[in-house]
Amino acid sequence: VRQQLEEIPMTVRPDPTFHATAKLAMQAPPETLAFTLMLSPDGSQPDGLAVIDVDPKSSKYGQIVHQVIMPNKGDEFHHFGWNACSSALSPLTGHAFLERRYLIIPGIRSSRIYVVDVKEPLKAKIHKIIEPEEVFAKTGYSRPHTIHCGPEGIYVSTLGGGGADGTDGPPGIFIMDCETFDIIGRYEIDRGPQNKQYDFWWNLPRDYMVSSEWGLPPQFENGLVPEDLLSNKYGHRLHFWNLRERKNVQTIDLGANHQMALEVRPAHDPVKEYGFCGVVVDTTNLEGSIWTWWREDGKFHAKKTATIPPEGAKKDDLPPMLQGFEAVPPLVTDIDLSLDDRHLYVACWGTGEMRQYDVSDPMNPKLSGSVHVGGIVRKTKHPSGKDFGYGPQMVEISRDGKRVYWTNSLYSTWDDQFYPGDRGAAMVKADVGENGGLTLDEKFFVDFPKGYRSHQIRLEGGDCSTDSFCYPNV
């Protein structure tokens, strides 16, 4: 046996797409494929995963080159993530030899979870399906949302608690085994005042996590509830956790008028103790806003560091929900931070604008680039001449920071409220200038199959909202 063991070539190495630092990840080869979720807004056909050619040298650039269509209807695909990423290189992990091979795709409406094997992207296939009953039984949660690959497992946030309408107990986070994909159990030991959930991320070496709030299922599943918005009943708090103790150590209220504190984006270099959060709308003036949060002397703080004003509009140009305001709110629905922690991208889904901020000074974001496409009133066409329905929504950045991709659907029922009628799915790309600035690529416009909308994007080999880095940049 010993002789047999000695003859086995020792070639086990960490996945080459795992990087110790964000700086090293930026030097990796550029992506040639993207993975984008397709959802059927009325549930008339199954949702799917599109594999898209993003190699400018390819004859199929900007085209869907493979699809994985699910066996069920009514899932509503939304966010998704990898089984493993650079967090596997943490000195605390026992999983250094995992590979970035599987995409974990939850159905936000069905609470079903799919595991898709993309080792051969053009032959991607379903590996495992976790039925909603297992999610409910093992966690007491429903409506799984955000996926993050942690050092000891896959973390999944949820938007619903138990019961048919998801309001029996607060939502939270649960952990899945990153090899078997079994659900292990709830994350929280002490949740403190947290009773809503949306996004979450962390600083692994500093051992803390931050989470945000959207609303409970009755507040979003059938559309935005205007009465709840105007009475400030959506989420407006950030929660800070001791990651290992699984304990809420501090909650910051951004103010009840700052409705829907959504995406949280910590700095990628773990030496830096700050990050950003986007707030959809201020109910006193319809502004969108960016908040910077940071830790100092053991305490967390948050401050509004950028605002985006609404745009005036004629009543007849607006959907019924906005006619009384005679204005279009920017509706900040997604943000993303480049790996060098320099550029923050802000999707203004209402006004049809993608903004780029220079956040080299995180307390003083400076607008450094902007492009318009779509929008409730503007309806700006893409440079290709095609209509871009809805507005810029889920945004993803290449590892080297030179390319920015985005899609246009927010959430099926909200799409229909703010943009009545079906506007079609789209995915576009902008190139980033050497000193900032954005230019839409007129050759890149992905058409999706009829009847589908498009939501989150993941890039081959990792991107800027996936990987957690455990070592400082050098």
Which residue ranges define each predicted feature?
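Short loop/turn segments immediately following beta-strands, especially the blade-tip
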Residues: V51-K60, V115-K125, C178-F181, F240-R246, ...
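Beta-propeller domains
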Residues: T11-P14, A25-L98, I104-E131, G166-D168, D190-P362, ...
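Structural signature of eukaryotic scaffold interfaces centered on beta-propeller domains
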Residues: T11-P30, E76-E99, G140-P151, W201-D207, ...
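Short, conserved, GDST-rich strand-edge loop motifs in beta-rich repeat architectures
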Residues: K23, A28-P29, T36-G43, S90-R101, ...
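Asp-box/WD-like beta-propeller blade repeats and closely related beta-sheet repeat scaffolds
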Residues: D117-L204
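Surface-exposed loop and turn segments in beta-propeller and other repeat-based domains
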Residues: Q63-N83, K128-G140, R186-N195, N248-Q259, ...
